[in-house]
Curated annotation (Swiss-Prot):
Function comment: Hydrolyzes ribosome-free peptidyl-tRNAs (with 1 or more amino acids incorporated), which drop off the ribosome during protein synthesis, or as a result of ribosome stalling.
SUBUNIT field: Monomer.
Primary localization: cytoplasm
Record-annotated active site: 19 (proton acceptor)
Catalytic reactions of this protein: an N-acyl-L-alpha-aminoacyl-tRNA + H2O = an N-acyl-L-amino acid + a tRNA + H(+)
Protein name: Peptidyl-tRNA hydrolase
Marked site (Stabilizes the basic form of H active site to accept a proton) residue numbers: 91
CDD domains to which the protein is assigned, alphabetical: PTH
Amino acid sequence: MLLIAGLGNPGPQYAHNRHNIGFMAADEIFRRHRFSNWQKKFQAEIADGVIDGEKVLLVKPQTFMNLSGQSIGEAMRFYKMTPADLVVIYDELDLVPGKLRIKTGGGSGGHNGIKSIDAHMQSFPGGQNYRRMRLGIGHPGAKELVHNYVLGDFAKADNEWLDTLMGAVADNVAMLARREDNSFMNRIALAMGDGNQRPGGVKTDPAQLEKAPPKAQSHIRQARQNQKKPNIPESGPMAEMLKKLLGKKD
């Protein structure tokens, strides 16, 4: 059995926040696969289904982000699961929008939801060795801007890459059930344009950058560059006259 937990804050006022991208991913998985209706249990909204022959429990903790571990730990104890059975989906400031990374174990990176889960996983065999799916939301640039940034809504310009990312995660979730994490990341990168994507859906190909045309020049400079050098005679009457005219010495 696999438990997929999407992190976020409950309530309509948070629904479109960057911090709620984990909830968004869980909702898209729910929509694209056969799951039971959402029900309230373990201080969460949960739904169960089967993906590629693997029983999957979707969990959206309703405890608010900072207490996510309470809900997830309760569900895992009920189903007698270990951290190896857990995948947590959450927002990552240190990845550009549209990037995705999966890693087993590691630190919290300052994410309060992950801090809470790490604390509750200490009572399980395997501790913090659960899979973490980080979805890039970008960084506002200064530490003091982070709070309002993560609790702010995605801009309309983000919808293109956000919809593509959510769809790719949901469509390829069977790879997570099979523990094919590298193949999953490769598939997402392809869906997002080989991973070379800037915020706002603008794709950048390194090969194209290397072959970029020179900067535009003014028509005067172009004319000067294309102008042929005059053919000045070096000897004869004309050469002598030019020397006198220009004051050129031998």
